[in-house]
């Protein structure tokens, strides 16, 4: 049986820990160890990842050293197979482009940001061109429905399968009924992080125009680190539109249970990034019956529509009545059947790893 090596090629602790926890706690108990146990991880602080006793972790201090180790393994054994989780490592793309890593050796789970081309500088534009070619030189991809469609517009010949990120969710919360307080101003969550792709200032202006200054807005901006200048820019813009009591900017990482309590109190989410991202937050909002606004350029709307979930689009006419109707529609959906919810996504992972390991055709 082929040993499948999982590659977390960029030091993104939050997402990497989610994947490792899922493999350690769930997949390692269900699938052969050759498909689930072996990981190569870029982690400057390997100890901070936490204990994962069911996994064999080979940690490297940065993206470059990890990529060199992956390339060495790929060249030493052309039967060796790798599963790239996300892929934010330029050296690995260049290795695929040059043939140091062969297409048949790699399966890639697209995380969204690694597929899209949002930066505008000429250096990024040149890299995007090379990366786009390299992204067609993999054996198979896995992604959301929307990202599969986006990817296959460029690389129609590469096999692609539906697979969802293993969002951290408590299935016990899926069936609960959350009553929304219809009295008083709405509470709106803006963005899923402090990343500029959330277009926070534009979102705040749109919310002010659509719902007025009396709504309460919450902006979780504890990630990424070293983002103080942008946070202050957003805060200043927000205070020009909303009172200090109605503007809450979260500048620290929030504990998971505390984050759930924040989401539970929301009436609407506002996410206008022009790509697929933030599925974890979207899933948690759906659990609590909270609809959200998405950009039409975010292909995840196709996954939502496939699951018969209400979709509100940025740029459409919105008011409180529209939001309350979306809440009503969301409350009527059988959330236990949503494909990208835990535990429904687990079977997809079982199929994906069999394909990636070459144990299924």
UniProtKB/Swiss-Prot annotation:
The keyword Isomerase does not apply. Keywords: Cell inner membrane, Cell membrane, Glycosyltransferase, Membrane, Transferase. InterPro entries: WecF. Pathway: Bacterial outer membrane biogenesis; enterobacterial common antigen biosynthesis. Transmembrane segments: none annotated. Its main location: membrane. Its EC number is 2.4.1.325. Catalyzes the synthesis of Und-PP-GlcNAc-ManNAcA-Fuc4NAc (Lipid III), the third lipid-linked intermediate involved in ECA synthesis. This is TDP-N-acetylfucosamine:lipid II N-acetylfucosaminyltransferase. The lineage of its organism: Bacteria, Pseudomonadati, Pseudomonadota, Gammaproteobacteria, Enterobacterales. The gene is wecF.
């Amino acid at each position: 049986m082929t040993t499948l090596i999982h590659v977390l090629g960029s030091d993104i602790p939050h997402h990497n820990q989610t994947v490792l926890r899922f493999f350690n706690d769930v997949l390692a108990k269900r699938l052969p160890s050759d498909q689930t146990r072996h990981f190569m991880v870029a982690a400057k602080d390997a100890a901070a990842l936490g204990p994962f006793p069911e996994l064999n972790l080979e940690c490297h201090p940065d993206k470059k050293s990890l990529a060199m180790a992956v390339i060495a393994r790929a060249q030493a054994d052309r039967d060796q197979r790798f599963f790239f989780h996300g892929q934010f490592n330029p050296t690995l793309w260049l290795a695929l482009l040059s043939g140091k890593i062969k297409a048949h050796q790699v399966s890639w789970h697209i995380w969204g940001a690694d597929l899209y081309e949002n930066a505008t500088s000429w250096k990024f534009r040149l890299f995007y061109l090379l990366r786009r070619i390299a992204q067609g030189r993999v054996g198979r991809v896995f992604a959301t429905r929307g990202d599969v469609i986006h990817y296959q517009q460029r690389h129609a010949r590469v096999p692609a399968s539906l697979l969802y990120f293993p969002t951290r969710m408590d299935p016990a919360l899926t069936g609960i009924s959350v009553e929304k307080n219809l009295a008083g101003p709405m509470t709106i969550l803006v963005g899923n992080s402090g990343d500029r792709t959330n277009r926070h200032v534009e979102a705040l202006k749109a919310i002010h125009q659509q719902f007025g200054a009396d709504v309460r807005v919450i902006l979780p901006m504890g990630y990424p680190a070293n983002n103080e200048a942008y946070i202050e820019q957003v805060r200043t813009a927000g205070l020009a539109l909303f009172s200090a009591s109605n503007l809450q900017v979260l500048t620290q990482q929030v504990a998971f249970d505390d984050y759930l309590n924040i989401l539970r109190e929301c009436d609407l989410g506002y996410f206008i990034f022009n790509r697929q991202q933030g599925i974890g937050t979207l899933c948690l909002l759906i659990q609590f019956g909270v609809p959200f606004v998405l950009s039409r350029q975010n292909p995840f709307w196709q996954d939502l529509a496939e699951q018969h979930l209400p979709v509100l689009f940025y740029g459409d006419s919105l008011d409180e009545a529209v939001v309350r109707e979306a809440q009503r529609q969301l409350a009527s959906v059988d959330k236990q059947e949503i494909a990208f919810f835990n535990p429904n996504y687990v079977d997809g992972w079982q199929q994906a790893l069999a394909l990636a390991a070459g144990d299924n055709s």
